[in-house]
Amino acid sequence: MRPPRRKGAGRSGALGDILHEPSVRQKVTAMPQTDQNRAREPRQRSHASAFAPDLAVKVEAAASPLSSPSGTPRQVAAEPRTAKHLQAGKPDEPRRATAGAGPGRAEASPPQLDAEAFAANLTRLAEETARASKAYLKPQLAGESSPWVNAEVGEIARTLGEVAERWMAEPQRALEAQTRLTSGLIGLWADALRRFEGEEVPPARPPDPADRRFKDPAWKQNPFYDFLRQSYVHTAQWAEDMVREAKDMDPHTRHKAQFYVRQLAAALSPSNFVALNPELIRQTIEQNGANLVRGAQMLAEDVEAGGGELKIRQTDTRTFEVGVNLATTPGKVVLRNDLIELIQYAPTTEMVLRRPLLIVPPWINKFYILDLNPEKSFIRWAVAQGLTVFVISWVNPDTRHADKGFDAYMREGIFAALHAIEEATGERKVSAVGYCVGGTLLSTTLAYMAAKGDRRIESATLLATQVDFKHAGDLQVFVDEKQVRAVEDEMRSHGFLDGKRMALAFNMLRPNDLIWRYMVDVYLKGKAPMAFDLLFWNSDSTRMPAVNHSFYLRNCYLENNLTKGRMVIDGVTLDLGRVTVPVYNLAAKEDHIAPALSTFEGSRHFGGEVRYVMAGSGHIAGVINPPTHQKYQYWTGGPVGDSFQGWVERAEEHKGSWWPDWFAWIERQASERVAARIPGGSKFMELEDAPGSYVKVKS
């Protein structure tokens, strides 16, 4: 009979705040020592044992021991199975034999490796690794591989090479820096030797409770692994210091170097290697390597699914389906053109605000981040407040859309939606919401409309939106003239930028949570990830049309033309100062994509009243924060002043969600209510039910 699975698996991470469950902590057990061992222990532990600590003594067991004193059951991985079989529990699970609790009962022996089973699993591991290698090499051999990876590696080498050059120009400072590194490591090793002797030594670098990589108690309780952890932290901090202290570096190069050092530090963590991670060693022994076989199976499947590139498995994608258990707010598609489907949502109140609401989501992701499920849906909540909600669903572009630029997204996106809303409701004036790059497009459109005297948008809400890119955060590391040209060259061959590129860029902003966590849990522990709607959305990437994306990179990130009055759309030079409609500008305190400072600076370029609000958490969780969850907080501080720091100091904190504050602001703009409207009205054919077809197209 198969024993039950262990509990304690951490919840999947997200693009916003990552929630972790605490590791299971159990008492450390050790093998009994003989008198002979005890007699010679002190001298040996200061030499050989210190370098090769006995796992049975010094590695804490995270779960019940694998075997009883009578022996260890053999485990050999089954024939190749799909991820579906893996998650269903069909592969062999380790049998956990534990000692009874009665008097005179011996304590369970530590995990023992079954050599025959381990050898069989190593054979299977080699087969699955070869399968993954074959999938990786297939596009390389066919001449279809993207040059992006090699270009990025070259950029990393060039950037870090500049740091090295600065230090080589100052040999004395370089020697002092090297001395700091080596003396720190020697001190840590001396502390480890004292701990091996049984002395209590406080760690020079205490564990960070928020760092889940080192949650296993062995990282703290075992002197060898504690030395390994502290040495890693010490070296990583030293590398960051080297970048920060390098002289005569321009800010952009230093920023890139800091970013790349963080990537390398995340990749080289000892927790990422089977031979250095006590939890992985323990699980591999307990399962005779079957965990590695399962992980290699999933690795091969994910490289195949990525067309030769690893598409990291962050969640169980089979659990979700757009339109079934995601994006389920009732509504109708009332307009479709080459770029958008416009969705009008069905009312749930008898009376609604006269002024309709148009939501312009980002096209870098899909709109259903605003409609994940009934409990998290901003769209459903807005409908429940009595708003007639229209949402643009952008096409997932292909080669046919290569020449669609920012101007096309304005005309065929926002302007087409405004015309359809007027036809469907009879209302010419609307309130508009823009999220992320959707907010940048909305701001651009407002400046264009101001130049043309068009006042159809009476108020604007910007969610985590940048219009001033001077402080644009870590995404700036991917944008300089050389890198933009490389992206343009890549897009030229297909007419679009593959969604995998943007997905990887976003994952690199949080490498420990969104890359290496899954490399370890999925591909080394062999655990199929949990179902998590937010991570499903995160992996449901979209492509970007070549002309549009080039315009965005150059005019926003590279040249910051919108706030400098140099952006031109359809021959019109744009000036945000001419935008006088009320603006509700929401930032997120921990946003790593549109930093709060960046969005604050953008507020000062508009010509009308701006209500700047800062939500707790990050780019996603700060925005998608329903009032019923009673999570986080938001700050209001009145008009935008001279400095962001000054605004923060005088801001007033409010518990919970910003959504009610926003709706009160919307209602103050135009509070008149009318009878609820049926989607499409009398002038539109209902093309299909929400969420439509465009959102279901995969990259």
Regions found by a protein language model. Give the residues of each.
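Amphipathic, low-complexity, repeat-rich surface-exposed segments
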Residues: 2-7, 13-341, 352-353, 390, ...
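Alpha/beta-hydrolase-fold enzymes
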Residues: 248-283, 423, 427, 445-549, ...
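Short beta-strand element of the alpha/beta-hydrolase
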Residues: 353-362
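Short amphipathic alpha-helix adjacent to the substrate-entry channel of hydrolases
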Residues: 371-388
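Alpha/beta-hydrolase active-site loop
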Residues: 403-424
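Alpha/beta-hydrolase fold nucleophile elbow
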Residues: 425-437
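Short beta-strand/loop motif that positions the catalytic acidic residue
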Residues: 585-587
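Short alpha-helix in the alpha/beta-hydrolase fold that links the catalytic acid
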Residues: 595-605
